[in-house]
Amino acid sequence: MDKFTTLEGVAAPLKIINVDTDMIIPKQYLKTIKRTGLGKGLFSEQRYRDDGSENPDFILNKPAYRNAKVLVAGDNFGCGSSREHAPWALLDFGIRCVISTSFGDIFYNNCFKNGILPIRVTQADLDKLFDDAERGANATLTIDLANQEIRGPDGGKATFEIDPFRKHCLLNGLDDIGLTMEKKSAIDSYEDKARRERAWA
């Protein structure tokens, strides 16, 4: 998993509340267990028309936001089913941070496991970030995880809270396997001791 320290990039405003995981990645994309290639399915029912052509009105199809790294979203983002494909699709598209006032619990946890930073902010801060994001190509936000700050294009700042353990994992690029490998020496020592003490086993 890639480390998350400081992220600077265009923020796309998605002013929709209660975006569920079915909307983030529709069911037809759930047949794969690969984490790559799902970016094409991200919000596919909103990004594409019935004939397969792009919907020019959807935010991520607008030229200024095609390479967005941050998504500023309405309340209760990622609610609904537990599909881990939702953060996979966001990550494959290039989004590494989602900012909202609240998230679906399972989606929130899955983001951390996949290297995405979900940030909870107040409604006042979200409204300001929506204003910043609507600047289009100038809608660059800086996400400073170490200092737990969001910096806007005009120099404004918003702070956020994060669990220290999850912060440690993101800063060091540690997924579940990485966390286990951090304890490799202790695991090896335990196994060596167990073999010596229970040679008969």
UniProtKB/Swiss-Prot annotation:
Q: Which family does it belong to?
A: Belongs to the LeuD family. LeuD type 1 subfamily.
Q: Which InterPro entries match?
A: 3-IsopropMal_deHydase_ssu, Aconitase/3IPM_dehydase_swvl, AconitaseA/IPMdHydase_ssu_swvl, IPMI_Swivel, LeuD
- Cite the entry's keywords alphabetically: Amino-acid biosynthesis, Branched-chain amino acid biosynthesis, Leucine biosynthesis, Lyase
Complex formation? Heterodimer of LeuC and LeuD.
Output the GO biological process annotations, alphabetical, semicolon-separated.
Answer: L-leucine biosynthetic process
Listed under catalytic activity are: (2R,3S)-3-isopropylmalate = (2S)-2-isopropylmalate
Q: Which gene name does the record give? A: leuD
Where are the membrane-spanning stretches?
none
Pfam families named in the record: Aconitase_C (PF00694)
Alphabetized Gene3D superfamilies for the sequence: Aconitase, domain 4 (3.20.19.10)
State the pathway, as annotated in the record: Amino-acid biosynthesis; L-leucine biosynthesis; L-leucine from 3-methyl-2-oxobutanoate: step 2/4
This chain's function reads:
Catalyzes the isomerization between 2-isopropylmalate and 3-isopropylmalate, via the formation of 2-isopropylmaleate.
Identify the enzyme class.
lyase
Protein's name in the database: 3-isopropylmalate dehydratase small subunit
Which EC number(s) does UniProt give?
4.2.1.33
